[in-house]
Every structure is written in C-alpha cells, then in structure tokens.
C-alpha cells in the first residue's frame, strides 16, 4: 500500500523526507552521478538535440496512429505464436495474469524489472492465490525484501546504502553478511539461480514493442531478464499500450536515446529482441508466450491537446535526476508508483480519483529542467501548470490562495492603488523589521522565512526614484550630465508619443 493510500499528504511525506539526512544525501549523490553521466554521453555523441527531435517525432507519429500500430503488433505477435490479451483496467490485467498462472499450475514466478507490474500491484495478487513472485533485478529484489516500493524508475533502491542492504540480505541468508558489494551480489546471484531453475513462469515488462514484426525489446544490465525469458516454460510480458514503435529502424533512435538518458551508457549490457515463443530449432525459450497490453487510463490522454504527449515517455528517469524537488525528497514522497516530474503528471492520469492526487502537481518548481533532460522533449513543466489550472477550474483550489490572487490582481491592476498599498506596507513593516530584514514566521511569511529572509520594503520605490529623475531633468537648479539629459529627454519624448525607447 502506498503512502498516499495510507492517508498521508504530499506535504507530510515531503516533510518526512526532508528530515531524513541520509535519504537526501543518497538521492542527491546518485542522481548527480546519473545526470553527469547523461550529460557526458550526450556531448560525446554529438547533435544531441537533433536526436531528441528525431525521438520526439517518432513518438508523436506513433501515438497519433496508436490504434493502427497496436493492431499491426497484435497481428504479427499472434502470427509468431504468442497469445495477445488487451486489458482496459488494472483489474483486468491482474485477472488475466492470475488466470494464466492458474492454467500453468504455477507455484512461482520470476520477474524482471517492470514498472507496469508495480502499477498493477501484481505481486500481492499472485501471493493471494499462493504463487510466489520473485523479483530478479537486484534493486527490485532488495526493495521486495524490505517490503517497499521503488523510489526511482531506473534505480529502485536509490534510497538505501550497502549497510542497510547487508542487513536485509543477512536476514534472508540466516547469517551475517559483510557490507561488501561483491559478497552481497554473489549471495543474491546464488539465491536467484535456484529460483530461476524452479520457476514455472517468467514475467517481464517491455521497453519497446516493434509493430512490424510483433517483437519485444528489453534493455538491462544484469542479465536477469534473459534468464526470465529463456528458462521458465511460460512467459508473460506486461506492456503499457504506448510502448509501441513502428519499426526496427525506429529502434536505432530509441536505443541511442534511452541508455544515454537513463545511465549515461552508450548501450546497456544486454539488449534482447524476443519474437514469439520457442520454435523447434531454438535451444531455449518459453513454450507459451502471453503478451498483456494494458490501458489503465492511458487512452484517456489520447486526443487531449495538453496531455497526449505524456504517452511519449520512454521511462528513462532523466527527468527525476534533473528535478530539484525529486533530488531533495526522493521518490516515496510522491506517494504513487511513478515519481518525479513524470510521476507528478502520470499518476493523476492513471488514477480514477484525480482529486486525491491534486497536490502532487505542486511538487515542482516549474523550472523546466525536466523538459531539458527529456530525450523526447515532453513539456512536463507545462503539463504541471495545466493540472494546477484544471484543479482550480474544478473548484478544488485553495480558497485562501484564490482570494489572495484576486486581491493581488486588484492591487496590481491600478497604479495608484498599488502605490497606496506599498505606503501602507511601509508603515506596517515597522513592527517587524529588524536590521533591514523581516524574519517573523507568521501567516504567509512562515513558509518563506523558515528557510530565507524577507528584505524590508525600500524607503524609495522605483516609481519614487523615477519621479525624482524626471524632476531633475526639468529643473534648472539641479544641472545634469548633458549626455544623460539628452538621452532622457529623447526617452521622455518617445514615451509621450507611445514609443518604448531604445
């Protein structure tokens, strides 16, 4: 169960995260390393923005013709011998998965990394019918032992150090294991090898599905996905409906963008293309392959001019690494399966109760770093503004904030009214100004002054100073530099004639 489902708000989760010094340090260190790796990889490749635009155009075209490419993929996948299922909701996808497990009389399922599986809460569903689900990605395995959810799309256990991991694995081993990376990885490798050999079903996600051949492509660094797709007799692939690309030639662009954006690699250690179940001449592979194509709210974005580009996402995690908010609070503070800027937009899109996730759109500074990092140029910062606007239009906005903005508009809409308010502010601030600073933490100043200092209103405003300049310009008693006087005189003439000056 997520933090949001337990009743915590975004603010409460963020406050908890900000109070966790280790979490902030670990997330900041790892995201900075990933961000720098991506930057260097992009610079080394060259023409990066051109490649981003190529990727964007491929995704725009694919999503605009999604029904065509989904049908093409399904037809070709079935021709290859795979069983293709379409699930409108998370509940349908889970029901299909459980039915396959029951038909196979499965006792255990080995899984490679899949955010869609997390989205469906599939492990809990499998456990409810007595099927053991084992995560085989190292980070996911650690998170599973800790009974937690991933806090990063690419690095699920970004919030844990090796000493914490050693404690989890020692409990699993029944003996104390040293906090040595090689020893810990060796233990997990041995443990999982037994699970691979005993598993009845292998379950994967899908990085890209190739419509022209009905193939699926998986990117990974550990080799566990290869084991998942070759050892068990039955394979289930969970695939968000937007994972389609038209052709293998399009994969060249995506294979250039995804690894560099995710981890700074030219290419992941393993890239597997899977086309149907095992054939007679194949040495390994599943006897049965099931592909579950999942909607779960995705189709609601189709045709929406503000949010359709959300479906362009290739799940690289670059926006998380660039986001100053994510780098301070980590992933769990967002409360859903997906975190960071993409999660702040995608979570409300996938959840039925949008109002429950209203505040998540405020977990952003709107700086646009996510857009600059995105390999397919998704304008996430604009989408966050759209979400905020829709919340207000639906009558779910903060009443005090709405009243304050209306008051601000009234004041700023009239110069005389603005000057009068400033004069009142100068009088009122005398009660709280100390040494030129306002440090009180009450009312609207509480949030700001907790971490910063509000400067006092200056004695002379810009308007006051400009009025003095005009007086000096037209006064014989106060001589002015002739060159300055000439420029100001021309400026004043232009203002009178409706110009803007040079």
Feature map (PLM): residue ranges:
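Helix N-cap / loop-to-helix initiation motif
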Residues: 89, 319, 379-380
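Ferredoxin-type iron-sulfur electron-transfer modules in oxidoreductases and energy-metabolism complexes
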Residues: 281-310, 325-441, 445-447
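Conserved, hydrophobic alpha-helical core segments of structured domains
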Residues: 311-318
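Predominant activation on well-ordered alpha-helical scaffold segments within soluble catalytic domains
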Residues: 74, 123, 249-252, 317, ...
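Phosphate- and divalent-cation-binding pockets in alpha/beta enzyme and binding domains
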Residues: 96, 118-121, 322, 373, ...
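Intrinsic disorder at enzyme termini
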Residues: 6-30, 404-502
């Amino acid at each position: 169960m997520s933090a949001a489902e337990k009743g915590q708000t975004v603010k409460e989760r963020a406050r908890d995260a900000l109070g966790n010094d280790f979490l902030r340090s670990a997330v900041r260190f790892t995201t900075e390393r990933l961000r720098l790796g991506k930057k260097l990889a992009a610079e080394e490749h060259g023409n990066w923005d051109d490649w981003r635009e190529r990727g964007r155009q491929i995704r725009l075209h694919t999503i605009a013709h999604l029904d065509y490419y989904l049908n093409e993929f399904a037809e070709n996948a079935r021709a290859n011998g795979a069983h293709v299922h379409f699930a409108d909701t998370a509940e349908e996808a889970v029901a299909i998965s459980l039915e396959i497990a029951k038909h196979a009389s499965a006792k255990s399922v080995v899984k490679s990394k899949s955010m869609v599986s997390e989205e469906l809460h599939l492990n809990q569903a499998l456990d409810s019918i007595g099927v053991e689900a084992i995560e085989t990605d190292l980070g996911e395995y650690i998170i599973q032992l800790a009974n937690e959810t991933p806090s990063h799309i690419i690095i699920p256990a970004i919030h844990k150090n090796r000493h914490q991991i050693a404690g989890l694995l020692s409990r699993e081993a029944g003996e104390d294991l040293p906090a040595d990376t090689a020893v810990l990885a060796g233990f997990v490798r041995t443990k999982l090898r037994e699970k691979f050999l005993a598993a009845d079903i292998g379950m994967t996600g899908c990085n890209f599905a190739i419509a022209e051949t009905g193939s699926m492509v998986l990117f990974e660094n550990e080799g566990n996905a290869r084991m998942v797709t070759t050892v068990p007799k039955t394979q289930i692939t969970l695939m968000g409906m937007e994972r389609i690309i038209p052709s293998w030639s399009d994969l060249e662009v995506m294979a250039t963008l995804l690894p560099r954006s995710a981890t700074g690699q030219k290419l992941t250690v393993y890239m597997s293309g899977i086309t149907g179940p095992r054939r007679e001449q194949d040495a390994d592979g599943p006897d049965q392959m099931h592909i579950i194509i999942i909607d779960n709210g995705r189709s609601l974005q189709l045709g929406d001019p503000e949010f359709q580009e959300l479906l362009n996402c290739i799940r690289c995690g670059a926006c998380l690494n660039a986001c100053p908010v994510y780098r301070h609070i980590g992933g769990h503070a967002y409360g859903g399966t997906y975190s960071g800027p993409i999660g702040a937009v995608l979570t409300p899109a996938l959840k039925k109760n949008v109002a429950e996730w209203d505040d998540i759109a405020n977990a952003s500074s709107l700086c646009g770093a996510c857009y600059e990092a995105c390999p397919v140029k998704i304008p996430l910062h604009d989408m966050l503004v759209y979400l905020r606007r829709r919340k207000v239009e639906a009558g779910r906005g903060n009443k005090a904030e709405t009243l304050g903005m209306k008051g601000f508009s009234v004041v700023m809409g009239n110069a005389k009214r603005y000057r009068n308010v400033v004069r009142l502010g100068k009088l009122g601030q005398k009660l709280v100004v100390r040494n030129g600073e306002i440090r009180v933490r009450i009312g609207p100043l509480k949030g700001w002054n907790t971490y910063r200092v509000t400067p006092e209103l200056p004695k002379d405003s810009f308007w006051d100073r400009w009025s003095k300049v005009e007086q000096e310009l037209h006064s014989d008693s106060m001589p002015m530099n002739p060159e300055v006087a000439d420029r100001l005189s021309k400026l004043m003439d232009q203002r009178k004639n409706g110009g803007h000056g040079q």
